């Protein structure tokens, strides 16, 4: 895996920014997205382009293995690496689908009010899934319960009925880029806000909403 891959992202002004990654760097990006998604309480920004590039890379690796000499130890090693990558990829996608099913009305509402140029939390396929899941949930509620209730009770507000992601939950993180003057909210009413500096390589247990922007920017890694 030595070829170079192009990955399109967004710069700070919302424009297109092209990143050139080696396959090893691409897999590292996938693993970072997987760990962040696994430990974040909310659905994070969609990494659809990384997923697409990884799937293309897996197909390319499969083709190379088909042409390789059978019985070669390298073939077995590359096959194991492919299975590891497939596991990470499928686990990442399953984690996102579970969050969509758990928080779908809030995710769709966030998508509705998202400003132009702001990264989406959903890939196009995930958006379709979330919409269909909400439609099926509403239909199920109507058929099972709501149609048997008085007319004034035959509507359900899913935004109120479905719990929101708990952004006050605590997460472990490792600092990748030094951060200064991070405002930390007090845990008790009698305490005051205070600021901390995050040094590269240091690990912390901290409330998620305090460092959510740093997770999005890649300055910290959830662990």
Swiss-Prot record:
Q: Which residues are reported to carry the modification N-acetylthreonine? A: 2
* Keyword flag Acetylation: yes
Q: Which CDD domains match?
A: GINS_A_Sld5, GINS_B_Sld5
| Gene Ontology CC annotation, any one | CMG complex
Return the annotated region ranges for Important for GINS complex assembly: 166-223
Q: How does it assemble?
A: Component of the CMG helicase complex, a hexameric ring of related MCM2-7 subunits stabilized by CDC45 and the tetrameric GINS complex. Associated with ORC2. Interacts with HELB.
Family to which this protein belongs: Belongs to the GINS4/SLD5 family.
Q: Function, please?
A: Required for initiation of chromosomal DNA replication. Core component of CDC45-MCM-GINS (CMG) helicase, the molecular machine that unwinds template DNA during replication, and around which the replisome is built.
Q: What name does this protein carry? A: DNA replication complex GINS protein SLD5
Organism, scientific name? Mus musculus (Mouse)
């Amino acid at each position: 895996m030595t070829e170079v891959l192009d990955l399109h992202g967004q710069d700070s002004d919302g424009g297109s920014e092209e990143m050139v990654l080696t396959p090893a760097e691409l897999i590292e990006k996938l693993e970072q997205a997987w760990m962040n998604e696994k430990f974040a309480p909310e659905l994070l920004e969609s990494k659809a382009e990384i997923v697409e590039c990884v799937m293309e890379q897996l197909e390319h690796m499969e083709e190379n293995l088909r042409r390789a000499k059978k019985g070669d130890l390298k073939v077995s090693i590359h096959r194991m690496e492919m299975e590891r990558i497939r596991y990470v990829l499928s686990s990442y996608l399953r984690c996102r689908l579970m969050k969509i099913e758990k928080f779908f009305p809030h995710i769709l509402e966030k998508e509705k009010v998202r400003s132009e140029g702001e990264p989406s939390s959903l890939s196009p396929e995930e958006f379709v899934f979330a919409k269909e899941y909400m439609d099926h949930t509403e239909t199920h509620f109507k058929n099972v319960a709501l149609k048997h209730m008085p007319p004034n009770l035959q509507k359900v507000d899913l935004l109120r009925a479905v719990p929101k992601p708990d952004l006050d939950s605590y997460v472990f993180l490792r600092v990748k880029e030094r951060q200064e003057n991070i405002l930390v909210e007090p845990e008790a009413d009698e305490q005051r806000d205070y600021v901390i500096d995050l040094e590269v390589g240091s690990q912390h247990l901290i409330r998620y909403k305090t460092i959510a922007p740093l997770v999005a920017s890649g300055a910290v890694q959830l662990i």
